[in-house]
Amino acid sequence: MRECISVHVGQAGVQIGNACWELFCLEHGIQADGTFGTQASKINDDDSFTTFFSETGNGKHVPRAVMVDLEPTVVDEVRAGTYRQLFHPEQLITGKEDAANNYARGHYTVGKESIDLVLDRIRKLTDACSGLQGFLIFHSFGGGTGSGFTSLLMERLSLDYGKKSKLEFAIYPAPQVSTAVVEPYNSILTTHTTLEHSDCAFMVDNEAIYDICRRNLDIERPTYTNLNRLISQIVSSITASLRFDGALNVDLTEFQTNLVPYPRIHFPLVTYAPIISAEKAYHEQLSVAEITSSCFEPNSQMVKCDPRHGKYMACCMLYRGDVVPKDVNVAIAAIKTKRTIQFVDWCPTGFKVGINYQPPTVVPGGDLAKVQRAVCMLSNTTAIAEAWARLDHKFDLMYAKRAFVHWYVGEGMEEGEFSEAREDLAALEKDYEEVGTDSFEEENEGEEF
């Protein structure tokens, strides 16, 4: 089997983990204590779900996951929560002191103490796999554990499991709302350190999700639970093809092959449709054409940026539910004609489609309506460079005054790492710019020399 191991790091990673495993359990008919419910045999017509769950001798299903935080409170909620019996106690790892929003604490001082234990637990999980295909790593860019510890973990996973894929689900600091002043520092340091270790990183921007909750779901004051349930739907759509049989089965490496044209350009933009509340869904016919079209609306995106200003390099449409290839082809043809979608000239075809016949599941009492079909679009577009530019600008404002830098240096970091990381991100912005320029322009330039 092609198993995937999920690693949830820091508060954001663990809380998203809660939402995701709650949803996965519902989708596979697994109850809170890990046993199969009455519907399970109907849903899991084969054993594809074992990519995410392992089965014990007495019929319990245990997530192939590890939750790590350098301070105990968030993971303690899992230990005492509804799904406390789902996880093996050793899968929930906590330290005693937190990283205090400081990358250097997560990566050097505090993180160093936990890393071997975490790798040891991950090793136990990988030993139980017959054909490990890779890791899914959930974390935030802004927190100390999410940024520092994750980048340390990624480095070590690369050492221990060289060729295995590592996909990240990363929470990008929102342009307006911020949970920590030093988010830009942490984000840029972690991006620099993990850039060469991550194969593909799906970024989710808190503010974009706040807006979706307000606009599409009519939630006036969205809580983290609202945000995480929405994020878990996206994670579920991306991983559905690994957990269910479909007409087009995508494994982790297939994502990279289709979405990542150059190793560094591995930040696809995620869009999901339909995001709609139950009251509205009742009055709308969400046809394949409609949901496909709404994927190209900037306000269904998980990161604030405008694809109309950028060019697409690749585009993956992952449909689930009552969808047939004919409808999809018609919908995509319509979009190609009417939308202002610009592909880079060196990548003419552009659309890859996956269809999964398992309809989307919703958490009972959640915000999303139960729909017959949904689509998740992963597109690699040069527009996402806007997100980096925003972050770099904030970094520059603080770093020009060397504000807060002493906290990092005090934890054993060198100031040179800041400028090194910043240069790497400047190079990343440049890479995006170059990828978007047309190839025939470059040919003409070459003749002058």
From Swiss-Prot:
Name of the protein in its database record: Tubulin alpha-8 chain
Catalytic activity, reaction form: GTP + H2O = GDP + phosphate + H(+)
Family: Belongs to the tubulin family.
Tissue expression notes: Expressed at highest levels in the testis, followed by skeletal and heart muscle. Expressed at low levels in the developing brain.
Names of required cofactors: Mg(2+)
MF terms in GO: GTP binding; hydrolase activity; metal ion binding; structural constituent of cytoskeleton
Pfam families: Tubulin (PF00091), Tubulin_C (PF03953)
An annotated GO cellular component: microtubule
Organism: Mus musculus
CDD domains, sorted: alpha_tubulin
Highest taxon of source: Eukaryota
